[in-house]
């Protein structure tokens, strides 16, 4: 470091930052600074940066300069507040809270009331004039500190608290008086000493330092890592730590705490949404332990604070130009803002809010497009419950996260995971969820809680994950020990089927039938976005999709093998077929003909088998070209190894053995068994398949090309506009392609001469082997188009057999952070993506008009679509149901890049 360079700054006062410093200050710290800048009532405090956390996580030690920086900021805070941290007569108390760049609700740690001790609790009694409040605050500190910082089992504190209420004959915490709470503090301290092997620290600075380290450590807890993996948040960002002077919502009926949203995060509708809890501290609301009142009720409880809060909500939404999620506390009639962030929302709310903000003039259409994503659109396409179905209503709660979920009732996360892994669909049912339930929530189809509101842990996390959730179903009594729920006389045991409607909050016994969502009906053309019965969600989706289609460069095709799928794809907005797998045309009743081809001993037998297949293939192609008239249809010639068309070797062996034992041997079965043995390969994925089949079995590819050409000619003569493209699979060298192309050109010429048509059929190849990608410049000499088969390219680049590795070690790789996400789900940009990028450049250098597409499963993956836009592909191809997602993401990619892609 040079003499003129400032040493790295690890601590920022709330007056120093702004909302654009999320990388450094985390979301919470950046937004506290922003609210401070706006002149809103924020308790004074400071933020320790994510850089300090990274140093700690990398080295195991805090940065050397951190303690002095924290001391300087603490001194400034004490001067401003005119009191010292934990002083015995008039203590300053602080909270220590996590705050990563991306919101991770409930995943990391918070400790409130730091600075309380046996001495300073007496000072807090004098300061507040409320003995019960002071001892309750001390009790909460020991409980939170013990669990979070010292690793004491939280259930031990809860059990002691329940026992105290039972002894007193009360059911809620607030009915315990100061004497009860003093006893509880003694008990809690004993629990800490016994379980943590040390006394609860009485030095306030030691409390603060240990809490800061605990927040740093909470970045790498199992639940935080699991959440990051689920939400695709990088693991190296670290968390900031916010040290904030305490304000108290538990000082009596004129105090309280709440969470507010500037719009309904479940539906997107404008209005006053949120939860409020009188005489409580902040964590009580989010934990869902006590049922809250609606935020609108605050108007009758404390109109002055309510009016001030509504004005602040309007200020924040206008400033952030988005739905804001706000945490606040009222201390004896004075409102304090503890946090704001752009709020998590459901998929439907995201689309509605984006278009509402355009109509209000706060954002433009390009920004609205960035406010939604393909994963949200996919959620909107899931089915909903049939309103006409006969149902048995169990109960009703708060509609926290929409969707229609059906599954077997389970009452803990372990069972949810276990049953889900064995293929069962489950509904996780709890009194309330906590961060330790995250893996169970991920495994479940839906979540049901008997406590908590729209801002509880279950609701916030479920909305973020797109999971169906109903909260606060108070009439449902959940018994986790006996693993059952009870509503009146109805008992639901673990394993019984229940249906949860996150859009209405209703819970049903048994399985309720589902119907297509309105969004799917819109894409299918059965609902017009401007029709009277079209809801505002469909109208919002239509507006955003129309803009995405206007700005995108990437075209979107479908993977479809028959006319029915092709027609559906076209309704969904497909601009052609990027992959028609001809092997799917050889299944069912036609399998016998393929068997004859495989068993052929002479040229004559083989030609006869091919002649039988030709008209069937041709008829399939005619239907396909008619369905996609005027749009390109890329037909892949036969790709899989031949043994896939033959009976299973074990079943066939048993059949032959049984027949021989009965002296009733079947000649055809014997020949089939010999063929199965002959064609058996140790690694069929890398064996006789793709172009190799066409080179080894004379006439196979010629028959397929003839069927394509004759079908195209017939459509042309019927005044159609067929645009067939012939794709050769698994090419590794240009010589393979040249030999097949020569044969194909000859067949096409024969068909053109016989039918008097000019077909203009393009011939290209799949790029699915590393050698093909590395020699793309040579292959482009014989190919008019490339289509990247990223499924096989991923397998061959990584040396993976997908079916084997996903069943064996993928989970371990994800847990160890070797993968952030499966490379079969999202394109591996560094490896596979690098080959795609170089093949694009080399191919276009040889043939500037080379058409480039991708037809692997990555074609419908949102993140991968952005990569394919960036490298300059012409189109992506995906399953029909994913087409709207690909269209949306292609638009988002174009709007983000502003012409930066390689086209």
Residue ranges and their predicted role:
Residues 465-467, 481:
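Residues forming the flavin
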Residues 68-72, 228-233, 369-419, 424-426, ...:
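Long, charged amphipathic helices and adjacent flexible linkers at domain junctions
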Residues 2-389, 418, 424-427, 434-439, ...:
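Nucleotide/phosphate-binding sheet-loop regions of phosphoryl- and nucleotidyl-transfer enzymes
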Residues 242, 410, 427-429, 448, ...:
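Structural motif
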Residues 445-451, 469, 555, 853:
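A short, small-residue-rich loop immediately preceding and capping a beta-strand
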Residues 18-21, 401-443, 552-554, 831-849:
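C-terminal accessory/binding modules appended to enzymatic or scaffolding proteins
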């Amino acid at each position: 470091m040079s003499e003129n360079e400032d040493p790295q700054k690890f601590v920022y006062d709330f007056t120093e930052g702004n909302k654009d410093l999320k990388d450094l200050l985390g979301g919470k710290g950046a937004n506290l600074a922003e609210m401070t800048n706006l002149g809103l009532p924020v308790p004074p405090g400071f933020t320790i940066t994510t850089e300090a956390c990274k140093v700690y996580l990398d080295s195991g030690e805090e940065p050397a300069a951190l303690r002095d920086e924290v001391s300087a900021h603490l001194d400034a805070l004490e001067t401003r507040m005119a009191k010292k941290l934990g002083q015995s007569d008039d203590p300053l108390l602080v909270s220590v809270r996590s705050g990563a760049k991306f919101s991770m609700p409930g995943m990391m740690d918070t400790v409130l009331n730091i600075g309380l001790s046996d001495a300073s609790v007496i000072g807090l009694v004098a300061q507040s004039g409320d003995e019960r409040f002071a001892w309750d605050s001390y009790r909460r500190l020991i409980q939170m500190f013990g669990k979070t910082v010292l690793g004491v089992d939280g259930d031990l504190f809860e059990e002691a608290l329940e026992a105290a209420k039972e002894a007193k004959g009360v059911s809620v915490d607030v009915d315990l008086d100061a004497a009860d709470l003093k006893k509880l503090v003694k008990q809690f301290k004993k629990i800490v000493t016994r379980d943590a092997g040390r006394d609860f620290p009485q030095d306030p600075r030691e409390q603060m330092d240990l809490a800061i380290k605990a927040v740093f450590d909470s970045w790498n807890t199992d639940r935080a890592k699991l959440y990051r993996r689920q939400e695709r948040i990088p693991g190296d960002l670290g968390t900031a730590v916010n040290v904030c002077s305490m304000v108290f919502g538990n000082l009596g009926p004129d105090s309280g705490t709440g969470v507010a949203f500037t719009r309904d995060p479940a539906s997107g509708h404008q209005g006053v949404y949120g939860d409020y809890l009188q005489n409580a501290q902040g964590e009580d609301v989010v934990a869902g332990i006590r049922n809250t009142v609606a935020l609108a009720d605050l108007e009758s409880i404390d109109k002055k604070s309510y009016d001030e809060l509504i004005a602040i909500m309007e200020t924040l939404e206008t400033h952030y130009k988005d739905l804001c999620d706000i945490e606040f506390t009222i201390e004896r009639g004075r409102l304090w803002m503890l946090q704001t962030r752009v709020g998590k929302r459901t998929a439907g709310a995201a689309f509605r809010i984006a278009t509402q903000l355009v109509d209000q003039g706060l954002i433009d259409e390009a920004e609205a497009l960035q406010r939604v994503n393909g994963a949200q659109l996919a959620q909107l396409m899931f089915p909903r419950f049939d309103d006409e179905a006969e149902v048995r209503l169990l109960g009703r709660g708060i509609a926290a996260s929409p969707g229609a979920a059906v599954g077997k009732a389970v009452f803990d996360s372990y069972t949810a995971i276990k049953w889900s892994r064995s293929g069962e669909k489950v509904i996780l049912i709890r009194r309330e969820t906590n961060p330790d339930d995250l893996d169970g929530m991920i495994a479940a189809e839906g979540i049901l809680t008997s406590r908590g509101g729209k801002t509880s842990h279950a609701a916030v996390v479920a909305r973020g994950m797109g999971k169906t959730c109903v909260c606060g179903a108070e009439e449902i009594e959940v018994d986790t020990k006996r693993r059952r729920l009870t509503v009146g006389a109805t008992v639901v045991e673990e394993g019984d089927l229940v249906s949860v409607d996150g859009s209405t909050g209703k819970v049903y016994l048994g399985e309720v039938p589902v119907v297509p969502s309105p969004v799917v009906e819109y894409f299918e053309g059965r609902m017009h976005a401007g029709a009277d019965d079209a809801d505002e969600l469909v109208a919002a989706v239509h507006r955003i999709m129309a803009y995405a289609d206007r700005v995108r460069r990437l075209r979107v095709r479908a993977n479809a093998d028959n006319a029915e799928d092709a027609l559906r794809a076209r309704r969904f907005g497909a601009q052609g077929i990027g992959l028609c797998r001809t092997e799917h045309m050889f299944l069912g009743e036609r399998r016998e003909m393929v068997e004859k081809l495989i068993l052929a001993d002479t040229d004559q037998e083989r030609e006869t088998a091919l002649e039988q297949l030709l008209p069937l293939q041709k008829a399939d192609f005619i239907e396909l070209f008619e369905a996609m008239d005027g749009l390109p249809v890329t037909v892949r010639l036969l790709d899989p190894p031949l043994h896939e068309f033959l009976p299973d070797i074990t079943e066939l062996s048993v059949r032959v053995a049984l027949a021989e034992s009965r002296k009733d041997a079947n000649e055809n079965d014997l020949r089939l068994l010999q063929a199965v043995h002959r064609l058996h390969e140790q690694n069929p994925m890398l064996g006789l398949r793709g172009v190799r089949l066409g080179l080894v079995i004379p006439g196979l590819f010629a028959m397929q090309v003839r069927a394509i050409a004759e079908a195209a000619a017939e459509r042309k003569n019927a005044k159609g506009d067929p645009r067939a493209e012939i794709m050769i699979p698994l090419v590794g060298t240009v010589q393979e392609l040249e030999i097949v192309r020569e044969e194909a050109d000859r067949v096409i010429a024969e068909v053109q001469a016989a039918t008097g048509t000019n077909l203009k059929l393009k011939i290209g190849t799949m790029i699915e082997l590393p050698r093909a990608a590395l020699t793309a410049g040579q292959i482009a000499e014989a190919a008019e188009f490339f289509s990247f088969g990223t499924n096989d390219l991923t397998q061959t680049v990584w040396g993976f057999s997908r079916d084997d590795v996903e069943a064996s070690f993928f989970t371990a790789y994800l847990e160890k952070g070797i993968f952030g996400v499966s490379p079969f789900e999202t394109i591996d940009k560094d490896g596979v993506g690098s080959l795609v990028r170089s093949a694009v450049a080399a191919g276009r250098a040889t043939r500037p008009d080379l058409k480039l597409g991708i037809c692997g499963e990555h074609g419908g993956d949102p993140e991968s679509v952005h990569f394919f836009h960036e490298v300059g592909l012409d189109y992506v191809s995906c399953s029909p149901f994913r087409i709207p997602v690909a269209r949306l993401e292609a638009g988002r990619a174009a709007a983000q890049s502003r012409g930066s892609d390689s086209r």
